[in-house]
């Protein structure tokens, strides 16, 4: 436990998940649920009810889903350049990644299939935030002034990518 570590106790190493390319770093890692859940109850974090699966991403461009019970990878996906951020869509099997390849991608951890790629950045995407799509929009649909709520636009999730060129772009997962 953290308390044991704080008081000088030792942590027990359980496993080493070693599949990213040698010499490259793992940049981001998150717990993820394989089965969507809206049930209330104990959570292991802000995005997952279970602690049996994780997703890692690194500077090798690889995104790897891990089964912690089996101690091995269960699937892999790839960007063309270093992955800078991975964020799980809360309590779902979906996650999004940002990369130096100028793209934001959304994946399904069960199949590791890409279910969406967002373009528009002219440089690397350094950070990413995901939130529930509440239908609030500001931009082209509203003439760039004010915000409005259109309940027909509730799509599930929207996310914001922070680009190295000094711009943040907002996307809706359709």
Language-model regions: role of each:
Residues 37, 62-64, 69-70, 74, ...:
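Eukaryotic modular interaction domains in large regulatory/scaffold proteins
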Residues 10, 17-26, 33, 77-83, ...:
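WD40/WD-repeat beta-propeller blade N-cap
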